[in-house]
Swiss-Prot record:
Zn(2+) 1 binds at H14, H16, K97, D242. PROSITE patterns: DIHYDROOROTASE_1, DIHYDROOROTASE_2. The modification N6-carboxylysine is found at K97. Its cofactor is Zn(2+). It holds the Pfam family Amidohydro_2. The gene is pyrC. The keyword Metal-binding applies. Homodimer. Pathway: Pyrimidine metabolism; UMP biosynthesis via de novo pathway; (S)-dihydroorotate from bicarbonate: step 3/3. This is Dihydroorotase. Belongs to the metallo-dependent hydrolases superfamily. DHOase family. Class II DHOase subfamily.
Length: 343
């Protein structure tokens, strides 16, 4: 087995960077090893306009000590109009993010009726202008079936808007894999946690709130199917971490926040998984090439990340001015670490 590994232009196609002091504290974990990342718009005040997105991008870049391209997205609301979409396109923003209302953190201003006339009209304009539609696809039903119950909506949009590129974000259900095979314009992202864990890691040995996320971790069969898609670098699947930091105090209460903070360990942990399954030769394609192709990326900083096979202890917490954040794999040892970042 190789003792070192080079990755070129890692891409994270689903990332939560938050704002204010939290943004300042966590940004380096993503900006340093990744060339670019799709930045989620679900802030306390959602990013619903081009002006807001550009201001947020400037804030992110002002805090970067390395070359990094934030790929901004617009929070889709029923009030989004063609002029705003044109402004976004002219500013280099190509991603719309659709949240079903109340489906996850910061989605209170999301869309209530997925297929109403207003929403379909926005899809039509988005198709015309060449946008990518990224969707947190969950119903309001039983928590383990929410993604599956949303699949007919994905199918409807894919059928009626065949030139609109649609992303099933943070795919968690093996039945979603079957759907992306049916429609040429339907793609997906996969997280580290959905390919390495299942519901047993949340509830099997006592409740672990640090593994609680949306969409929920599913069954062992789901995990295995998604893992194989990653290990094989499925042509329609890109890596998207959905790294979502919450303070420890927000996770450890009676209404614990949904989200897993994986940014500090992403590349070493992925190297560990792919090495264990003798698939290191597919990691470059999964972590970068698929995103560049599926999102038609043309402008991003060139980076080479060198990893080495050596014990890498994960700290018990990440300290911020606001309090502690518990990272994924806290207080365990990874078998790979980042040795060098050429940027």
């Amino acid at each position: 087995m190789p003792q070192t590994l080079q990755l070129t232009n890692p891409m994270d196609m689903h990332l939560h960077l938050r704002e204010g002091e939290m943004l300042s504290a966590i940004l380096p974990f993503s900006a340093n090893p990744f060339s670019a990342a799709v930045v989620m718009p679900n802030l306390k005040t959602p990013i619903t306009t081009t002006a807001q997105a550009l201001a947020y991008k400037r804030q992110i870049l002002s805090l970067c000590s390395t070359s990094f391209e934030p790929l901004m997205s617009i929070f889709l609301t029923p009030d989004l109009d063609k002029q705003e979409l044109i402004r976004a396109k002219e500013a280099g923003i190509h991603i719309l993010k659709l949240y079903p209302k109340g489906s996850t953190t910061g989605s209170e201003k999301g869309v209530k009726e997925m297929l109403c006339e207003k929403t379909l009209h926005i899809f039509e304009i988005a198709q015309e202008l060449g946008f990518i539609l990224s969707i947190h696809g969950e119903s309001n039903g039983f928590c383990m079936e929410r993604e599956y119950e949303f699949l007919p909506i994905f199918a409807h949009i894919a059928q009626h808007f065949p030139r609109l590129r649609i992303i099933i974000e943070h795919m968690s259900d093996r039945r979603s894999l079957e759907l992306i095979e049916q429609y040429p314009n339907l793609y997906a992202t996969l997280t580290l946690h959905h390919i390495t864990m299942n519901l047993d890691d949340v509830l099997g040995g006592g409740i672990n709130p640090h593994h609680f996320c949306k969409p929920m971790l599913k069954t062992k069969k789901d995990q295995q199917a998604l893992l194989q898609a990653a290990l094989n670098a499925h042509p329609k699947v890109s890596f998207g971490s959905d790294s979502a930091p919450h303070l420890e105090s927000a996770k450890l209460n009676s209404k614990g926040a949904a989200g897993i903070f994986s940014a500090p360990i992403l590349l070493p942990a992925l190297a560990e998984v792919f090495a264990f399954h003798n698939a290191l030769d597919c990691l470059q394609t999964f972590i970068s090439n698929r995103a560049i192709a599926n999102y038609k990326l043309k402008h991003f900083p060139i980076k080479t990340i060198t990893l080495e096979r050596v014990e890498n202890p994960v700290p018990p917490y990440i300290n911020t001015p606001l309090g502690h954040i518990i990272p994924l794999r806290a207080q365990t040892n990874l078998s790979w670490r980042i040795k060098e970042e050429n940027r």
